[in-house]
Amino acid sequence: LAISRMTSQAHAKGLENEKRRIFSTAIWLFFGLGLVCSVLMFFRADALARFLNNSLAATAVQALAPAVFCVCLLACMRGYTQGQGNMTPTAVSQVLEALLKLGIGLPLAWYVLHIGKTAELSAAGAIVGVTAGTAVSMLFLCAYLVTHRNRKESLDVPSSSGQIIKQILLIGVPITLSNSAMSIINIIDTKIVMGRLQNGLGLSETAAAVLNGQYRI
């Protein structure tokens, strides 16, 4: 949303260099943030799963980790195209993402169970569909932006990268925090429920995970 708003303002004023600077600064910022978060999530999956009192989820967390990187870049590219009033790339990328999530995740989850693997590996297989969907969606937008590169000449002097990053944070952080509220509540809820099922009722981790899954349904 922050990228879309900033790009829209520059687009309305005809500031082509400003638009390019916003995108180039944002893409590198989100590239770094996404890469760090994905690496931490992948290699610290066990710690995150233990925090949720569900060590069985570690494999699924690792399967989801690359998607974090892809989503960061997707947000930047979608914001850039939307800010120019072009919703088609976003719409196509979202359709691709949804189709692959279902088309890869569901068959893979079924296949893993069919060959006799554990439920947690089947869950990880389903999550692979999410990662594949976001990755293909990201590649589609990359190809679109390369083939539709902004080559318009302009004499405007763009803002510095530092100013753009500051503006992204000022706009984006409050929005991100408000949108993350429900996700944070769900994480805390999962931790509490799994902990009470195991420590309060004395259930095994597997039994607690099954009951927690039924509770979520």
Language model features with spans:
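Small-residue-rich midsections of specific transmembrane alpha-helices
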Residues: 1-8, 68-70, 216-217
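Transmembrane-helix boundary and interhelical linker motifs in polytopic inner-membrane proteins
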Residues: 1-28, 83-88
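Short membrane-interface helical motifs at transmembrane helix boundaries
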Residues: 36-56, 114
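Helix-terminus/linker motif at the lipid-water interface of multi-pass membrane proteins
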Residues: 49-50, 117, 176, 180-217
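Alpha-helical transmembrane segments of multi-pass membrane proteins
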Residues: 54-77
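Membrane-interface junctions at transmembrane-helix termini in multi-pass inner-membrane proteins
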Residues: 72-93
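Hydrophobic alpha-helical transmembrane segments
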Residues: 93-107, 116-147
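Interhelical loop/hinge segments that connect adjacent transmembrane helices in multipass membrane
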Residues: 119-127, 142-179
